[in-house]
Regions:
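Periplasmic polypeptide-binding modules associated with outer-membrane biogenesis and secretion
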Residues: 7-143, 154-158, 163-172, 185-186, ...
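Transmembrane beta-strand segments that form the barrel wall of outer-membrane beta-barrel proteins
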Residues: 69, 120-130, 137-160, 168, ...
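Transmembrane beta-barrel wall of Gram-negative outer-membrane proteins
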Residues: 171-275, 279
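Outer-membrane beta-barrel translocator domains and adjoining extracellular loop/strand segments
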Residues: 139, 165-169, 194-200, 212-215, ...
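Short loop/turn motifs that connect adjacent beta-strands in outer-membrane beta-barrel proteins
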Residues: 21-23, 146-152, 174-181, 205-211, ...
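C-terminal transmembrane beta-barrel domains of outer membrane proteins
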Residues: 8, 323-528
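Feature captures outer-membrane beta-barrel proteins of Gram-negative bacteria and organelles
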Residues: 137-145, 164-177, 195-207, 212-214, ...
Length: 528
């Protein structure tokens, strides 16, 4: 494990956690050391700018990190828990880097030191993006680590192709002194409003024995329908949803975790003609779902640590173990549903590492849900991703995904276009009951690190795909579509917000009048 100088240990006992576990060592003192964004002792980060940023930032409180740890004083050393703790800490966007090391070992007891380095968490949003021919802008302020407590508070004003308005949100992942998550969101837009509230104590680790969840949302909006990238129909959609569930698990046994949950989904969807808006399709039908459910989950504990895959020069974890989740529900007319129906959802994923070091990830899904026609809809599909490193700073990436729906109406069709992965075309350019999309990229990860703030990378890409079948096909350009392009990737890895800026030039290879010869896309993503 490699860390910046500020995270490197001056000395360490000769044994690693694996050897300590085999020796039966017990954890003594656990020390948490939370550090500021920049290491002022590093000559590359010792300037006035870095010192000013550190002074403006409030460092994460040690107890925030301590409550995330899966081990404590008196426990026997477990390499699995050490590794999983590192994975959990790296998922916290308020953390830039993590080191967990044995600090001292004597008489069968080992002291452990956990060192973290913060990210900049105050987001003064003033952003613009263009993707699929659509512009999106945002202005606001969001603090993801208020006073170092892990509390996230934000206000934003956004505008995109569908709506504009303001939102406030609050989120806290350590409520009641533990691991309970609380989140609240309230938005007011030119086409309606949205409110949601969530209380969730999840299965936060592979060995967690119980989980409880309750969520509520209420939304009023205008839903658009597009054909050939053009807006052709709009209607008002009001929806209310409630979910409650509780889960049980025996924990991690022999490298596998099994979980069983029970709960209920309640959902009301209502549709209305909106005055002044064109409606060229049949209005969707109101429907209600009242569905008790059972959910089963199976997870294999297999992760690998990599670098220069989905991010630039940052430690990542890829899950290569088998994961299965199956949920079966019965929507009951006797509980207030529009009609009694069996509903289900299943998802399975797995990963393989080849002798060459290349990694293949696969996923398959199937779902039966109530569609906008108030009748059942079945959707199934698969996705495969290949990561093929060429060197420490370059990687070939390929993905292919295919899915199909049977049942439902125009509002339930599968979409394909610029914001759906086909970068050379307008957003929602094709729609249909069947969809296939393949993306190929050659990624470059440079060592250039301007101002110790921005990691720089690039990509050349080729996309090909098609959506077809159903009542809302693109009859103008409904065949296979493809594009080629190049892009710059700027990873702001010292910040807690959307980390990777994508600057792409994409050229569609099958154009019709109205489609630009070159699409310029600007957007922020969490990954490469």
């Amino acid at each position: 494990m490699s860390f910046p100088p500020a995270l490197a240990a001056e000395s360490a006992p000769p044994l690693g956690f694996g050897e300590l576990e085999k020796s039966g060592a017990v954890i003594g003192e656990v020390r948490v050391d939370t550090r500021n964004i920049f290491d002022l002792g590093n000559p590359a980060e010792s300037g006035l700018f870095y010192g000013t940023v550190n002074r403006l930032h409030i460092v994460t409180r040690p107890e925030v990190i301590a409550r995330t740890l899966l081990f404590k004083s008196g426990d026997r050393v477990s390499l699995q828990k050490i590794d999983e703790t590192e994975r959990l800490l790296r998922t916290l966007r308020i953390i830039h880097d993590v080191e967990i090391r044995p600090a001292a070992f004597e008489d069968g007891k080992v002291d452990i030191e956990v060192t973290t380095r913060d990210t900049w968490t105050l987001d003064l949003t003033g952003s613009y993006s263009r993707s699929g021919g659509n512009d999106k802008s945002a202005f606001g302020v969001k603090e993801r680590n208020l006073l170092g407590t892990g509390l996230s508070v934000g206000y934003s004003r956004t505008s995109d192709a569908d709506r504009s308005g303001t939102e406030i949100d609050l989120a806290y992942g350590q409520a009641f002194g533990g691991r309970t998550q609380i989140a609240f969101n309230r938005g007011r837009f030119d086409d309606g409003a949205r409110t949601s509230f969530l209380v969730d104590r999840p299965f936060y680790s592979l060995d967690t024995r119980g989980a409880v969840r309750g969520g509520w949302s209420n939304e009023d909006r205008i839903d658009p329908i597009y054909n050939s990238g053009e807006l052709v129909s709009e209607f008002r959609h009001r929806l209310k949803a409630i979910e409650v569930s509780a889960g049980w698990s025996a924990g991690l046994v022999g490298g596998w975790t099994r979980r069983l949950s029970a709960g209920a989904d309640l959902r009301d969807d209502a549709y209305r003609v909106e005055p002044g808006r064109a409606l060229t399709i049949a209005l969707p039908l109101d429907h209600r779902v009242r569905a008790p459910f059972l959910r089963y989950e199976l997870l294999e504990d297999e992760f690998v640590k990599v670098k220069n895959y989905r991010n630039i020069a940052r430690t990542e974890f890829l899950g290569l173990g088998f994961h299965l989740q199956v949920q079966v529900a019965r929507s009951l007319e006797g509980l207030g549903a529009t009609r009694s129906e069996w509903l289900y959802a299943a998802e399975a994923s797995d990963g393989i590492t080849f002798e060459s070091g290349h990694k293949l990830l696969g996923q398959a899904t199937v779902e039966r849900r109530v569609a906008s026609t108030a009748t059942p809809l079945t959707q199934g599909g698969f996705a495969v991703q290949l990561y093929a490193p060429r060197s420490t700073d370059s990687l070939s990436y390929a993905s292919i995904a295919a899915d199909r729906v049977r049942g439902g109406g125009v509002a339930d069709q599968l979409l394909l276009g610029g914001t759906q992965g086909l970068r050379g075309y307008p957003s929602r350019y094709q729609a249909g009951e069947n969809r296939v999309l393949a993306n190929f990229e050659q990624r470059l990860y440079s060592d250039w690190y301007p101002f110790r703030l921005i990691r720089v990378g690039g990509a050349a890409f080729f996309d090909i795909g098609r959506a077809w079948g159903g009542p809302n096909q693109n009859l103008v350009n409904g065949g296979w579509l493809s594009d080629v392009g190049v892009g710059l990737r700027l990873a702001f890895d010292r910040t807690a917000f959307a980390n990777v800026l994508h600057l792409d030039l994409a050229m569609p290879l099958r154009r019709t009048p109205g489609i630009k010869a070159v699409q310029f896309l600007v957007k922020t993503e969490l990954t490469f």
